Amino acid sequence: MRPKKLNQNKGSELLRKLMTERNYLILGVDGGGTQSRARLCAYSGRLLADAVSGPANLRLGTEASFSSVLDAARQCLKDAGMAQQNLSRIVACLALAGASEPGQLEAAKRHRHPFRAAVITTDAHAACLGAHDGKDGGVIIAGTGAVAWALLKGKTYRIGGWGLPISDEGSGAWIGSEALRRVLWAHDGRIAWTPLLRELVADFSDDPHAIVSWTAAASPREFGAFAPRVADYARGGDPVAIELMRTAAAHIDSLAARLMALGAPQLALVGGFAGALRPWLAQQTTSQLVQPAGDAVQGALTLARATAQSLQDVA
C-alpha cells in the first residue's frame, strides 16, 4: 500500500513549524531598577533556564542596561547546557524600566545585540500582560520605582513612573530619599529624632554633610536600599517610619484610584516593595486587588513568542 501523500501546503506549514521550534529560543527579560530577571524557553514553551543579573533601567544608561540583559541571557544558556553561540537563535522581549521615555526607547532600539530579534517594551507593560494573562486590567509596580499601567480595549495607559526626583512617589527609592530628608530635618531641630533616624544618620558617621554629598550621586537603587529598614521600623512603631509608610501607601492608593477611574476591571500590585506596602493601603484599593496570573517575565515571554511567530509567518 502506497503511503498517503502529504498535502503540499500542510507539509510546508509543518516544515516551517519544525524549523521554528528547532531554530528559535524564546527569552523574556524583566529589567528593573534593582535587578533583571530572565527566563529562557524553547519555542514550544518548555522552560530551559532562569537567571538574575544587575539592573536594566534605561535611565541609568543603555550600555549598562544591555550589559545586564546579556549577562542574564548568557547565564540562561549556561544553565541550560547550551553554547553561547546560541545567542543568535534567541528571539527576546526586553521589558525595561525607563523604556516609556521616547528618547531612551529609541536609543535602546538602535543598540546592537546578538539576538535573532528583540522587541523592547516597558517593564510595566510586560507586568500588566503577565498579571492578567493578556486580558484587560491594571497593574501597579511598587519596587525601586513606582508606576501604574493599564491595558484596556486595546489601549495602554501609564500613570506616574517618571523617575526620581520628580516622580515615583511611594516607591522604595522615594521612601529612602524621604527618610534621609527627615534625618536632615531632625538634625535641624524641625522634628524629633527617632530610632530609625538615628540609625540612618549613623550610616553616615553622624555627618549631615556626608548625606548631602552621597545623595548628589546616588542611584534609585541605592536610595531604595533604605526602604526595607523603614518598613521594619514602621512595624515596630517608629513614628517617622509609620508616617513614611502611610504617605507612600497614599501615593499607591492614588495610582489605584486613577486606574479604576479609567475603567480597569481588576488591579494587581507587584514589585519588590509591594508586600511591605500592602498592609498600609486603603480598603478601597485592596478590595480591587487580584492575585497576578503571571509576572513581568511571563508577559515578556508572551511578546517574544508573538515576535517569533511573526518571523515564522514571513519565512
Which residue stretches match the model-derived regions?
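N-terminal loops that bind phosphate or other acidic moieties
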Residues: L96-G98, L262
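ATP-binding/phosphotransfer module of carbohydrate and carboxylate kinases, centering on a glycine-rich
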Residues: R2-K4, K10-S88, G130-G138, L180-A315
